[in-house]
From Swiss-Prot:
EC category: transferase
Keywords associated with the record: Cytoplasm, Magnesium, Metal-binding, Nucleotidyltransferase, RNA-binding, Transferase
Major site of localization recorded for this protein: cytoplasm
Top-level taxon of the source organism: Bacteria
Protein name per the record: Polyribonucleotide nucleotidyltransferase
CDD domains per the UniProt record, alphabetical: KH-I_PNPase, RNase_PH_PNPase_1, RNase_PH_PNPase_2
Its EC number(s): 2.7.7.8
Biological process, per Gene Ontology: mRNA catabolic process; RNA processing
Subcellular location: Cytoplasm
Gene: pnp
Alphabetized InterPro entries for the sequence: ExoRNase_PH_dom1, ExoRNase_PH_dom2, ExoRNase_PH_dom2_sf, KH_dom, KH_dom_type_1, KH_dom_type_1_sf, NA-bd_OB-fold, PNPase
Pfam families assigned: KH_1, PNPase, RNase_PH, RNase_PH_C, S1
Length: 732
């Protein structure tokens, strides 16, 4: 049975959900359509009972954009989609983060969600439709799921909020925020903004949530029409006597440890010691307490000696101790108050050969950030279903295992690294200079050297500082902070600049970046249902105060971008040449432009309109390249003095001198010196640079070629070309 439901979101936008036509062997499958953009989402969840030792939900979300969807061929040599692009990875992360909290606690069955974009009108981006389709596929399946989830994008054009703006509308929007949520609450945020206020941010979220409620109701109606029963599921029940024993055995020690301010490594060692001793005690106690008859009568009692289950119970006690300490005493693991930011230290210019660098340390989180400036040739080519462009501003985030004191593999960039780098990039990009203001390609690399929470926000701060150190003219400084939340019933506490443990044991991770004038980027993940707007408002205001405190520290280190670029950064010089001269500068097969680069060390880029950009780290190289290019396109004029290179010598005739690139003239033997010259090679050598004057231009009657007559002796008293004296003589 094919079921189709649709809803009008207003502003001429209609979304439909269809199920029952495609992918019927999956546990659930839906097709979502908006305009001519269509996505199909499927979900399959294994029925194999997970091991009692498993403590995580193996959810895999894959988002793929098929090039046929837009009538395109994949770029590159192989005309087939291969590994996911950065855009696909980021879209998959958005969907994963919104879906994951809505599965039942303890549901550890392997689950795979696959979203394929099968049609793209190149105006409606499919990423948020993928989130809607994924949730709808789970809703119509037999897989347990708490509530329908929907994703929307909110934009604002000319002060008017828009749901799921088109690509063209986003061009003029000052907000681009993706929101995921249920009918009752928001569970995921991510986006970039052009310095909007906290109040405007809340308004955008509320606006998006109203559309989410409608889309969740649409999913509920589709589910009701399908009427498929959910498979039975009950989380693993741990015997109550195990919980009581663990609490008695370790709660007091864990509480004492929680109230002691310690460094991350020392706290981890002492926590590990408590875990080990409690585990040993529990295994010994219950092994002696239960006979084989007891275990036969109640098999669940065997869980009391399962080491993994015991560690989970200890972890539950540890979590409760930390949360009650924060809620009851407003005290945190490292002794800070709820809104206190960790100590900050900043060092600039720490990498001598980089074009800008900074070492930003906040507590036990440290980022070493380097900036590289390049030309348009260094821009990254990005090809998606909706856009093909060159990306000239990028931030790459690296999180090596040593940053958390672990041994791990170094290989391809992980999804987490791509996501964190993208967030930091979006935060800083809002204040980066335009291409017209600063025609460089900018690459920022953040190396996380230590991590105890909020490393992506350290990358925002470090990236801003490195750019300012490198002389990149940022409009304003940007800082970032990660906020946390502990909530039990009506009690709650908002935490500023959270630690790794506070992120892990808490209910929210809310990252906010911005300038003194407003927010430039945000990302939020919620682990609980029922986030009230007044809590969100409190978190945003507390984040604003924290951001300003960090900005104060950053401005103490460097109040504004340096006036000059770093010593080793390339200097860009732009000159305009006639369009018809472009081929002359490039030369046959690029021969001429390569020779200029080899001779001067300058990198040269030529636009179709005749704009020539010269990049070189030395003024001499830039000057040399400019002179060669100007000489290449210059028309030879009689009476002009040139510096040329001897190309060939004919002893009884004269010397052929290249006086402008690719153009030779003859210095007759009689024009070499004032005295009589018997043999040219006695006066000139091949490769020698000589000053010559163009004395005649004429066409060869036999060949029709232009011949240039040069004189060395006529140039003896003339000033060198390029000097003020030469310019004065030319003007006269």
């Amino acid at each position: 049975m094919i079921i189709t439901k649709e809803i009008d979101l207003g502003q001429g936008k209609t979304i439909s959900i269809e199920t029952g036509r495609m992918a019927k062997q999956a546990d659930g499958a839906t097709v979502v359509r908006m305009g001519d953009t269509m996505v199909i989402a499927t979900v399959v969840s294994s029925k194999k009972t997970p091991s009692p030792n498993q403590d995580f939900f193996p959810l895999q979300v894959e988002y793929r954009e098929k090039y046929y969807a837009a009538g395109k061929f994949p770029g590159g040599f192989f005309k087939r989609e291969a590994r996911p692009s950065e855009k696909e990875i980021l879209s998959a992360r958005l969907i994963d983060r919104a879906l994951r909290p809505l599965f039942p606690t303890g549901y550890y069955y392997e689950t795979q969600v696959i979203i394929n974009v099968i049609s793209s009108d190149q105006q409606n981006d499919a990423d948020v439709l993928g989130g809607l389709a994924a949730s709808a596929a789970i809703m119509v399946s037999d897989i347990p799921f708490e509530n329908a989830m929907s994703e929307v994008r909110v934009g604002r054009v000319n002060g008017q909020f828009i749901i799921n703006p088109t690509i063209d509308e986003l061009e003029g929007s000052d907000i681009d925020i993706s929101i995921g949520g249920t009918a009752g609450t928001i569970c995921m945020l991510e986006g970039e903004m052009k310095e909007i206020s906290e109040a405007e941010m809340l308004e955008a979220i509320r606006f998006g949530h109203e559309a989410i409620k409608k889309l969740c109701a649409l999913q509920d109606s589709v589910q009701a029409a399908v009427a498929k029963a959910k498979r039975p599921f009950a989380p693993l029940q741990v015997p109550s006597e195990l919980g009581a024993f663990i609490s008695d055995a370790c709660k007091a020690r864990l509480k004492e440890l929680a109230y002691t301010a310690l460094a991350k490594e020392e706290r981890a060692e002492r926590t590990k010691e408590i875990y080990g001793e409690t585990l040993k005690s529990a295994v010994e106690h219950f092994s002696a307490a239960f006979s084989s008859e007891d275990l036969a009568a109640d098999p669940s009692k065997a869980l009391c000696t399962n080491e993994h289950i015991i560690e989970e119970e200890i972890h539950s006690v540890e979590k409760d101790v930390m949360r009650r300490m924060i809620l009851d005493d407003a005290k945190r693991l490292d002794g800070r108050t709820l809104d206190q930011v960790r100590p900050i230290s900043i060092d600039l210019g720490v990498i001598p050969r980089a074009h800008g660098s900074a070492l930003f340390t906040r507590g036990e989180t440290q980022a070493l950030v380097a900036v590289t400036l390049g030309t348009k040739k260094d821009a990254q080519s990005v090809d998606t279903l909706t856009n093909s462009a060159d990306k000239r501003f990028m931030l790459h985030y690296n999180f090596p295992p040593f940053s958390v004191g672990e041994v791990g593999r170094l290989g391809t960039t992980g999804r987490r690294e791509i996501g964190h780098g993208n967030l930091a990039e979006r935060a800083i990009r809002m204040v980066a200079p335009t291409e017209q203001e600063f025609p460089y390609t900018i690459r920022i690399v953040s190396e996380i050297l230590e991590s105890n929470g909020s490393s992506s926000m350290a990358s925002v701060c470090g990236g801003t500082l490195a750019l300012m150190d490198g002389g990149v003219p940022l409009k304003k400084a940007v800082s970032g902070i990660a906020m946390g939340l502990i909530k039990e019933g009506s009690e709650y506490a908002v935490l500023s600049d959270i630690l790794g443990n506070e992120d892990h044991l808490g209910d929210m991770d809310f990252k906010v970046s911005g300038t003194r004038d407003g927010i430039t980027a945000c990302q939020m993940d919620i682990k609980i249902d029922g986030l009230d707007y007044h809590i969100l408002e409190t978190a945003l205001e507390q984040a604003r105060r924290g951001r300003f405190h960090i900005l104060d520290k950053m401005e103490e280190a460097i109040p504004a971008s340096r006036e000059d670029l770093a010593h080793y950064a390339p200097r860009l010089t732009a000159i305009q040449v006639p369009v018809e001269s472009i081929g002359l500068i490039i030369g046959k097969g690029g021969e001429t432009i390569r020779s200029i680069t080899e001779e001067t060390g300058a990198e040269i880029n030529i636009e179709d309109d005749g704009t020539v950009t010269i990049a070189c780290s030395s003024n001499e190289g830039t000057k040399g390249a400019v002179e060669i290019i100007k000489a290449l396109i210059a028309k030879p004029e009689v009476g002009t003095v040139y510096i040329g290179k001897v190309r060939d010598i004919r002893d009884e005739l004269g010397a052929f001198v290249e006086f402008i690139p690719k153009t030779d003239g003859l210095v007759h033997i009689s024009e070499i010196a004032n005295e009589r010259v018997a043999k040219v090679s006695d006066h000139l050598k091949v490769g020698e640079r000589v000053k010559v004057k163009l004395v005649d231009i004429r066409k060869d009657p036999r060949t029709g070629k232009t011949r240039f007559a040069l004189s060395i002796k006529a140039a003896l008293d003339a000033p060198d070309p390029g000097t003020e004296a030469a310019a004065a003589e030319t003007n006269s």
